[in-house]
From Swiss-Prot:
Name the record gives this protein: U4/U6 snRNA-associated-splicing factor PRP24
Record region (Disordered): 1-29
Compartments it resides in: Nucleus
Residue ranges with Basic and acidic residues bias: 1-16
InterPro entries hit by this protein: LSM_interact, Nucleotide-bd_a/b_plait_sf, Prp24_RRM1, Prp24_RRM2, Prp24_RRM3, RBD_domain_sf, RRM_dom, RRM_occluded
Pfam families noted in UniProt: Lsm_interact, RRM_1, RRM_occluded
UniProtKB keywords: mRNA processing, mRNA splicing, Nucleus, Phosphoprotein, Repeat, RNA-binding
Self-association state and partner proteins as the record states: Monomer. Interacts with U6 snRNA SNR6 and the LSM2-8 complex (small nuclear RNA); to chaperone formation of the U4/U6-U5 tri-snRNP (small nuclear ribonucleoprotein) assembly, the protein is displaced from the U4/U6 snRNP once pairing is complete.
């Protein structure tokens, strides 16, 4: 459960720039990014009564300071509860710790900083949900306080989780038992989270500026040896990636990605921009992130007027931005009993809180359109329809939420005088007498 908070403006007078205090403040701000982390602002509460839910925990600790998030979990024997409370500021966490040994109900609670208790887990099966991860820890008798999955809004391939457990010992035990565990052909990676020991990202070449994207290639130019010969003069090439499916669909504007061993080589290769390769003028630029192609395909489909293409796809909506294509595929196979061969592709449409599912043919898509509408997915009713249906639903939801926004004080003040004038109009009208009514109805 998340709670909003408002920062209190600083009312103190500004320090002189040359003063020692100002120098210390500058140093503190410079290091703020390093020191601002959940471990400083998050506390663990042990031995809460079984009746305590998120709301009760929030009410009990809200006087300590603004609260961002509260999680509650049962102990293994279910005889008491844990709570994880994330405050907006460090002083809120300090105030909460002063409540340790207080009696809540009939239980004496223990409050402490939640440090070195966060796990980083990755490479679990794509179909895994929070429940699967929670069950995984429960199987080794460890309580998961909270499980945080990444948003897939801009990158649908992200697959990791941050998991808070109740002690350092449990965190180390999880690493011992789960790191390297084989699950459905995937080797699980589990580590104690440490911001100072970040693993190298899979898209590091893109972020380091060592990867280029070559556009406007013909299908004949989609040859790794040809591309290597054309670009190896600029520096050592680490690898070349040619996205699949371009030759099969006879795209007129194909592309390829090339990773150099260093940034300077990639920048020199930009000289090839707008040069001729074969009989085509190619475009060369530093590569965008990997989701570039997928987002481009989504944009193309959203604007498409090709009726034959549109007849083979349906949209599912509304969906959370943490739902992956793998989870949707699993749902279609296990709950709707669709054969994986009948699904050509699943694309997330984060701009409209939905997904596009492309099927093998239009008849099958029409059948699925009727079957999937109103079905249950992750405890919620979802709709199915065309791209226009998804857009219309999203826009209606946006308009509906706008209607429920309370008018501001300024708007009320502006409308006030007009309302008063309208109320005075009836008072100015003269009341009709009996003679007036006789003339109106009897014509006298």
């Amino acid at each position: 459960m998340e709670y909003g908070h408002h920062a209190r403006p600083d009312s103190k007078r500004p320090l002189d720039e040359g003063s020692p205090a100002a120098a210390g403040l500058t140093s503190k701000k410079a290091n703020e990014a390093l020191t601002r982390n959940r471990e400083l602002t998050t506390v663990l509460v042990k031995n809460l009564p079984k009746s305590y839910n998120q709301n009760k925990v929030y009410k009990y600790f809200k006087h300590c300071g603004p609260i961002i998030h509260v999680d509650v979990a049962d102990s293994l024997k279910k005889n008491f509860r844990f709570a994880r409370i994330e405050f907006a500021r460090y002083d809120g966490a300090l105030a909460a710790i002063t409540k340790t040994h207080k009696v809540v109900g009939q239980n004496e609670i223990i409050v402490s900083h939640l440090t070195e208790c966060t796990l980083w887990m990755t490479n679990f099966p794509p179909s895994y949900t929070q429940r699967n991860i929670r069950d995984l820890l429960q199987d080794i008798n460890v309580v998961a306080l909270s499980i945080r999955l990444p948003s897939l809004r801009f990158n649908t391939s992200r697959r990791f989780a941050y998991i808070d457990v109740t002690s350092k010992e449990d965190a180390r035990y999880c690493v011992e038992k789960l790191n390297g565990l084989k699950i459905e052909g995937y080797t699980l990676v589990t580590k104690v989270s440490n911001p100072l020991e970040k693993s190298k990202r899979t898209d590091s070449a893109t972020l380091e500026g060592r990867e280029i994207m070559i556009r406007n290639l013909s299908t004949e130019l989609l040859d790794e040896n040809l591309l290597r010969e054309s670009f190896e003069g600029f520096g050592s090439i680490e690898k070349i990636n040619i996205p699949a499916g371009q030759k099969e669909h006879s795209f007129n504007n194909c592309c390829a990605f090339m990773v150099f061993e260093n940034k300077d080589s990639a920048e020199r290769a930009l000289q090839m921009n707008r040069s001729l390769l074969g009989n085509r003028e190619i475009s060369v630029s530093l590569a965008d992130k990997k989701p570039f192609l997928e987002r481009n395909e989504v944009k193309r489909l959203l604007a498409s007027r090709n009726s034959k293409e549109l007849e083979t796809l349906i949209c599912l909506f509304p969906l959370s931005d943490k739902v992956s294509p793998s989870l949707i595929c699993q749902f279609l196979q296990e709950e709707i009993h669709i054969n994986e061969k009948d699904i050509r592709k699943i694309l997330l449409v984060s701009d409209f809180n939905g997904a596009i599912i492309i099927f093998r043919d239009s008849k099958f898509a029409a059948k699925m359109l009727m079957i999937l509408n109103g079905s249950q997915f992750q405890g919620k009713v979802i709709r199915s329809g065309t791209i226009n249906d998804m857009k219309r639903y999203y826009n209606n939801q946006q308009n509906h939420s706008m209607k429920h926004v309370k008018p501001s004080c300024i708007n009320m003040m502006e409308k006030g005088p007009n309302l008063q004038v309208k109320k005075k109009i009836p008072d100015k009208q003269e009341q009709m007498s009996n003679d007036d009514f006789r003339k109106m109805f009897l014509g006298e």
